[in-house]
Amino acid sequence: MERTFIMIKPDAIKRRLISRIIQRFEEKGLYLAASKCVIPKREVLETHYSHLSSMPFFSEMVEDMMSGMVLAMVWVGKDAVSIGRKLIGETNPQAASVGTIRGDYGVSTGKNIIHGSDCVENAEKEIKLWIGDDVQPVSFFDKEWIY
């Protein structure tokens, strides 16, 4: 089974959207394998978003992400990365389809509620960065029913 990294950002936590977001992943048949609530450190954010470091909004984004808790999660299931991306929607909530997390709850590109890995390789890097190596294997007792 494939793993993906999903992070609920401070704007969603401040708006009390955690349960609504988690419900969408569970309803799609993904399993929550690990989670961690943390106020992110600058170093972790700079590593996570290193591909955006030359962008003019980078410093403001890092400061905003440090403004409150994030919920870092590992979700497991068949095609977990692509399912996660479809559930999340476009980066810009204004362009995201209604029915996606960002389309329904996002306010702006800077307040877009959630992060999701874009490929399996990045998912594994992000899981290691945010959660570490302590993710236990998931028992799929209902695998045949879901898949």
From Swiss-Prot:
**Which Pfam family, any one, appears in the UniProt record?**
NDK
Identify the cofactor(s). Mg(2+)
Q: Which residues form a coiled coil?
A: none
- Keyword vocabulary terms for this entry: ATP-binding, Kinase, Magnesium, Metal-binding, Nucleotide metabolism, Nucleotide-binding, Transferase
Q: Might you give the EC number(s) for this enzyme?
A: 2.7.4.6
The Gene Ontology biological process terms listed for this entry are: CTP biosynthetic process; GTP biosynthetic process; UTP biosynthetic process
**Which residues act catalytically here?**
115
Catalyzed reaction equations: a 2'-deoxyribonucleoside 5'-diphosphate + ATP = a 2'-deoxyribonucleoside 5'-triphosphate + ADP; a ribonucleoside 5'-diphosphate + ATP = a ribonucleoside 5'-triphosphate + ADP
Report residues binding ATP.
9, 85, 91, 102, 112
Kindly give the InterPro entries that the UniProt entry links to this protein.
Answer: NDK-like_dom (IPR034907), NDK-like_dom_sf (IPR036850), Nucleoside_diP_kinase (IPR001564)
Gene Ontology MF: a single term: metal ion binding
Q: Which family does it belong to?
A: Belongs to the NDK family.
Q: What does this protein do?
A: Major role in the synthesis of nucleoside triphosphates other than ATP. The ATP gamma phosphate is transferred to the NDP beta phosphate via a ping-pong mechanism, using a phosphorylated active-site intermediate.
The record, for PANTHER family, names: NUCLEOSIDE DIPHOSPHATE KINASE
UniProt name for this protein: Nucleoside diphosphate kinase
Tell me what organism the protein belongs to: Encephalitozoon cuniculi (strain GB-M1) (Microsporidian parasite)
